[in-house]
């Protein structure tokens, strides 16, 4: 065991403050804002977050768009082939 000040075993003097001296904060500026104030805060936070975004360059955007379009076309082809195959199986089984 250590006898260091502020450790779990030996708390320092700041940790022993009486409960009556500690102030509990209720409300404050955040709790007193009306609906329009909260809405304005929401939009300010949106703008702040959008400023943090690292936007892709034009070449990256072209590459990403091409990859998505090719993937969608391949998936459309796969679903079409499966649909035609199932239709033929159902037609064969049920006449």
Swiss-Prot record:
GO terms for cellular component: plasma membrane. Keywords: Cell membrane, Membrane, Protein transport, Translocation, Transmembrane, Transmembrane helix, Transport. GO terms for molecular function: protein transmembrane transporter activity. The keyword Transmembrane applies. Component of the Sec protein translocase complex. Heterotrimer consisting of SecY, SecE and SecG subunits. The heterotrimers can form oligomers, although 1 heterotrimer is thought to be able to translocate proteins. Interacts with the ribosome. Interacts with SecDF, and other proteins may be involved. Interacts with SecA. NCBIfam families: secE_bact. PANTHER family: PROTEIN TRANSLOCASE SUBUNIT SECE. Essential subunit of the Sec protein translocation channel SecYEG. Clamps together the 2 halves of SecY. May contact the channel plug during translocation. This is Protein translocase subunit SecE. It comes from Streptomyces griseus.
